[in-house]
From Swiss-Prot:
Subcellular location: Mitochondrion inner membrane
Sorted UniProt keywords: Electron transport, Membrane, Mitochondrion, Mitochondrion inner membrane, Respiratory chain, Transport
Keyword Signal: no
Family of the protein in this entry: Belongs to the complex I NDUFA12 subunit family.
Topology term for the membrane: Peripheral membrane protein
Segments forming a coiled coil: none
Function: Accessory subunit of the mitochondrial membrane respiratory chain NADH dehydrogenase (Complex I), that is believed not to be involved in catalysis. Complex I functions in the transfer of electrons from NADH to the respiratory chain. The immediate electron acceptor for the enzyme is believed to be ubiquinone.
Oligomer status and interactors: Complex I is composed of 45 different subunits.
Name this protein carries in UniProt: Probable NADH dehydrogenase [ubiquinone] 1 alpha subcomplex subunit 12
Pfam families in the cross-refs: NDUFA12
InterPro entries: NDUFA12
Gene that specifies this protein: ndua-12
Cellular component aspect of the GO annotation: mitochondrial inner membrane; mitochondrion; respiratory chain complex I
Protein species of origin: Caenorhabditis elegans
Lineage: superkingdom: Eukaryota
């Protein structure tokens, strides 16, 4: 064990290298806030939603692949924003990323869409044909009995 490792200086050097690779202290704090981890890896590819997929085999197997969602999503990310081909790569179902080896396309497969029920303005609300049984009282109005 070297003196550098014993004093922990190698950890400080590794952290400094990560800060440099990520793009500065501000970028590290932003990534730490969004992902709860400060990871550095090679960009494997991106999809049509703007997600960026990374891999670093220095981490152990379930955590060596990850996705970074675009800034427009911020903290409102959802698992449905990851297309199926990238999902299979993230979960080690396939070894090759879709950017390297695209999966075969079928005529009957629809294009992937994210779940829109998380957005209030795009949420599906069925039309109701029944009257409400309970009506809220508004001050200053006479009650209406049918």
């Amino acid at each position: 064990m070297s003196l550098k490792a014993w004093l922990g200086i190698d950890k400080i050097q590794k952290f400094g290298q990560m800060v440099k690779e990520i793009g500065g202290v501000k970028a590290v704090l932003k990534k730490r806030y969004l992902m709860d981890a400060t990871r550095v890896g090679t960009l494997v590819g991106s999809d049509n939603f703007g997600n960026r997929y990374y891999e670093n085999n220095a981490y152990f197997v379930p955590r060596n692949r990850w996705v970074e969602f675009p800034d427009k999503v911020w903290l409102d990310y959802d698992a449905t924003q990851v297309p199926p081909e990238w999902h299979s790569w993230l979960h080690h179902i396939t070894d090759d990323a879709p950017s390297v080896k695209p999966p075969p396309t079928q005529d009957w497969v629809l294009e992937h869409k994210e779940n829109t029920s998380i957005y209030a303005d795009k949420k599906y609300v069925p039309y109701s044909t029944t009257r409400t049984k309970i009506q809220g009282w508004q001050p200053g109005e006479k009650p209406q009995f049918d």
